[in-house]
Amino acid sequence: MAKAKFERNKPHVNIGTIGHVDHGKTSLTAAITKVLGFLGSAEYKAYDQIDAAPEERERGITINTSHVEYQTETRHYAHVDCPGHADYVKNMITGAAQMDGAILVVSAADGPMPQTREHILLSHQVGVPYIIVFLNKCDMVDDDELIELVEMEVRELLSSYEFPGDDTPIIRGSALVALESTSTDINSPEYAPIVALMKEVDNYIPTPERATDKAFIMPVEDVFSITGRGTVATGRVEKGIVKVGDEVEIVGLMEAPKKTVVTGVEMFRKLLDQAEAGDNIGALLRGVQRTDIERGQVLAKPGSIKPHTYFEGQVYVLTSAEGGRHKPFFNGYRPQFYFRTTDVTGVIEIPEGTEMVMPGDHITMKIKLITPIAMEEGLKFAIREGGRTVGAGNVSKIIE
């Protein structure tokens, strides 16, 4: 069957849900597709369709990022449902990097929890520019004053991570009430909070200025082979434009970049002549074996970005209250560094005269990776150890 062409008639925005486990991120995502489905601009995806990876069902928690798409009257959205559980912060780091704005889901019954804080911190570190709050499960709280208190707490938390807490839109509602309603009228009261939320998302999150005029780069998230056609690399175009027939380089996780040609581009299972910054795509690559390319590398315009192993980074070390280390670390500390979609072990050199680095410190340090990563100044990374985030930073200077 021939694939339909993807129509680019509305501005495209990438958003996602973040927040503590069981506060209702996936239910809210399902409710948005249900309500916008009444306008004919979304396909309703039930909770268990979004929560779809096999290992998720047994635990009832979301592990991988799920992508859904929908439209409002003014925009086309790609929505990622980000993992909420602390074990899966690793995926949050790769998922949150794909957001022009985020919907922070907070249960009105529980208020902000440890992962609420962690996700706000991560959003700040990976550069999610806007956060809107959906205060979920309001049907479970009878006392308005309690909801007011939760709202104040959330605003303070946002402000403490440099988001404009006082001006952040907060919508109260219940995703479950919207999901359980049998009404097909979008004006039903149980759908009002979802309608109000999407209106705020339309208005508060600006249409991103896409970096389309910059050199093409796409971090590789996944790779698979299509029999008879070749190898496809999937990911979100970070900058620039890629056209069918363009020469690109595979950069990172190896000494020298490899050249190839993009022979096909598709998005949401539809073929495109070209893809631009912000698009989640699959790129078909000429003459590339399934084993020649892997998650953590990037596709880039030839010569535009180089692989490096040694750099200076500005680093913030999390406190134990933020889920970080309880103890300091010293010169020669070897954690994992998460860049874009993968982790690489590196060795830390702390500045002369500094004996150790304490939780809560903000420090400039040199980092030597064991494998090269496609790198430019300003690139963000997270520092991880034993499955948890212990620091965050960005590349301030490339040494070699």
Curated annotation (Swiss-Prot):
Sequence positions that bind GTP: 19-26, 81-85, 136-139
Q: Which NCBIfam families match?
A: EF-Tu, PRK00049.1, PRK12735.1, PRK12736.1, small_GTP
Q: Which reaction is recorded as catalysed by this protein? A: GTP + H2O = GDP + phosphate + H(+)
Q: Which residues bind Mg(2+)?
A: T26
Which keywords fit this entry according to its UniProt record?
A: Cytoplasm, Elongation factor, GTP-binding, Hydrolase, Magnesium, Metal-binding, Nucleotide-binding, Protein biosynthesis
The cross-references to PANTHER family, in alphabetical order and at most eight, read:
ELONGATION FACTOR TU, MITOCHONDRIAL, ELONGATION FACTOR TU-RELATED
Q: What is this protein called?
A: Elongation factor Tu
What is the organism lineage in this UniProt record? Bacteria, Bacillati, Bacillota, Clostridia, Eubacteriales
- What is its subcellular localisation? Cytoplasm
Could you tell me what this protein does?
A: GTP hydrolase that promotes the GTP-dependent binding of aminoacyl-tRNA to the A-site of ribosomes during protein biosynthesis.
Region annotation (G5) ranges: 174-176
